[in-house]
UniProtKB/Swiss-Prot annotation:
This is Adenylate kinase. Monomer. Its EC number is 2.7.4.3. Pathway: Purine metabolism; AMP biosynthesis via salvage pathway; AMP from ADP: step 1/1. The lineage of its organism: Bacteria, Pseudomonadati, Pseudomonadota, Gammaproteobacteria, Thiotrichales. Residues 30-59 are annotated as: NMP. Consists of three domains, a large central CORE domain and two small peripheral domains, NMPbind and LID, which undergo movements during catalysis. The LID domain closes over the site of phosphoryl transfer upon ATP binding. Assembling and dissambling the active center during each catalytic cycle provides an effective means to prevent ATP hydrolysis. Belongs to the adenylate kinase family. GO terms for molecular function: adenylate kinase activity; ATP binding. The gene is adk. CDD domains: ADK. It is found in: Cytoplasm. One of its GO terms (biological process) is AMP salvage. It catalyses: AMP + ATP = 2 ADP.
């Protein structure tokens, strides 16, 4: 099973991706995680990527395809995989097709923008462990402190409202074209991904069940 998981920043893609990965025993390929690891390395390319993300822009198609191509060649992807964060553009989708990557399902987790903004701007992170909290939905026991270590929590630099609105604008502009691309795929290809739109405003387990009901 090969799945593309779509959803705006803050839609809960990461949570659903982990649940899908465990249920179907497929590899979860998160470009976001791979990009963050590159930034942590403090290399020159990592510094450039940080500037791009801080400005609310998307990483180049060339870089994304390069890291995805390398990742899907690994043995753990032979049983299938879930792409989280790619493709985001028509160019990326076309490049995946050129690589012979046949997709079975396109799953979009749809959440209203006002809720996404609330989710993201209230997010707080413990840098060392990656533990994530939320000022409203999942607050720490002590405000601004990690529950386990007591260390300070931070707000990611790209989690401010202006940057979030810019990211959402870019996401919507590109995703609508991407969905049209895959819908039109049927005119020239016998194997067409099934497009599934899921209401992401629901509880996590309800979102998961709705996805499972469609992945048959």
């Amino acid at each position: 099973m090969r799945i593309i998981l779509l959803g705006a920043p803050g839609a809960g893609k990461g949570t659903q991706a982990k649940i899908i990965e465990d249920k179907y025993n497929i590899a979860h390929i998160s470009t976001g995680d791979m990009i963050r690891e590159t930034i942590k390395s403090d290399s020159e390319i990592g510094k450039e990527l940080k500037k791009v993300l801080d400005a609310g822009q998307l990483v180049s198609d060339e870089f994304i395809i390069k890291i995805v191509k390398d990742r899907i060649s690994k043995d753990d992807c032979k049983n299938g995989f879930l792409l989280d964060g790619v493709p985001r553009t028509i160019i990326q989708a076309e490049e995946l097709d050129k690589l012979g990557v046949n997709i079975d399902y396109i799953v979009e987790v749809d959440v209203k923008d006002n809720l996404l903004i609330e989710r993201i701007t209230g997010r707080r992170v413990h840098p060392a462990s990656g533990r994530t909290y939320h000022t409203k939905f999942n607050p720490p026991k002590v405000e601004g402190k990690d529950d386990i270590t007591g260390e300070d929590l931070i707000t990611r630099t790209d989690d401010n409202e202006d940057t979030v609105r810019e990211r959402l604008s870019v996401y919507h502009a590109q995703t609508s074209k991407l969905i049209d691309f895959y819908r039109n795929f049927s005119s020239t290809n016998t194997k067409t991904p099934k497009y599934i739109k899921i209401d992401g405003d629901q509880a996590v387990d309800k979102v998961s069940q709705d996805i499972f009901n469609q992945l048959k």
